[in-house]
């Protein structure tokens, strides 16, 4: 049996349907608004396809239509398209306004989260500096003139920073804050606040965007 392995995540499903229906779906650039009822059309076209289930299609469509690049494409005067790229009517103003509102709310959440992270990082840095100065004042003077290496120097400074919204892209390398330190990983899938990453040991996990750093 040729290439019959079942797809495992929404990213793979979106890539697959974009390959099957290139005039309707795209994996990069601005997406086209989809025909109302496109799920039913997809389910019928792929009914005999063992690689993808209806549940996977529904989840992938939800992620696809809530992505920033899809919401950017929902504009006044633009036509919806079916699986074959045929126009299916101009977008209604109500749908355009809804998409614009959803996009702005999503971006506002990212901006607020980045601001909170910056404030928390600044507070932690200030607190750490105060503790360092306090410990330094209590330390006895060395009995010899040989320079003494501070234990703090043994731990490299954290030069990571919070991700910007534009850096949250599939394939980008990031650092995942695991509490005890940052772990290198790469983004394999994202949907608003949740991001699926793959660690260097091959383990995949879903984390919140605030736990990702660059």
Swiss-Prot record:
NCBIfam families: PRK04950.1. One of its GO terms (cellular component) is cytosol. The keyword Magnesium does not apply. HAMAP family: ProQ (MF_00749). This is RNA chaperone ProQ. Residues 104-163 are annotated as: Disordered. GO terms for biological process: post-transcriptional regulation of gene expression. Residues 133-154 have a biased composition (Basic residues). It is found in: Cytoplasm. One of its GO terms (molecular function) is RNA strand-exchange activity. The lineage of its organism: Bacteria, Pseudomonadati, Pseudomonadota, Gammaproteobacteria, Vibrionales. It holds the Pfam family ProQ_C. The gene is proQ. Keywords: Chaperone, Cytoplasm, RNA-binding.
């Amino acid at each position: 049996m040729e290439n019959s392995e079942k797809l495992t995540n929404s990213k793979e499903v979106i890539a697959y349907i974009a390959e099957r229906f290139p005039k309707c779906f795209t994996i990069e650039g601005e997406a086209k608004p989809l025909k109302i009822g496109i799920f039913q059309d997809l389910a019928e076209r792929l009914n005999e396809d063992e690689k993808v289930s209806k549940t996977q299609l529904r989840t992938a469509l939800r992620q696809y239509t809530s992505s920033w690049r899809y919401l950017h494409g929902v504009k006044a005067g633009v036509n919806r398209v079916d699986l074959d790229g045929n126009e299916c009517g101009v977008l209604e103003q109500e749908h355009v306004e809804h998409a614009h509102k959803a996009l702005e709310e999503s971006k506002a959440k990212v901006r607020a989260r980045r601001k909170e992270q910056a404030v928390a990082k600044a507070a932690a840095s200030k607190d750490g500096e105060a503790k360092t100065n306090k410990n330094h004042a209590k330390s006895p003077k060395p009995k010899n003139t040989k320079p003494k290496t501070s234990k703090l120097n043994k731990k490299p400074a954290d030069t990571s920073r919070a991700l910007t919204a534009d850096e949250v892209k599939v394939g980008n390398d990031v650092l995942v804050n695991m509490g005890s330190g940052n772990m290198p990983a790469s983004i394999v899938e994202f949907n608003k606040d949740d991001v699926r990453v793959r660690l260097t040991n091959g383990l995949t996990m879903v984390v919140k965007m605030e736990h990702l750093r660059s």
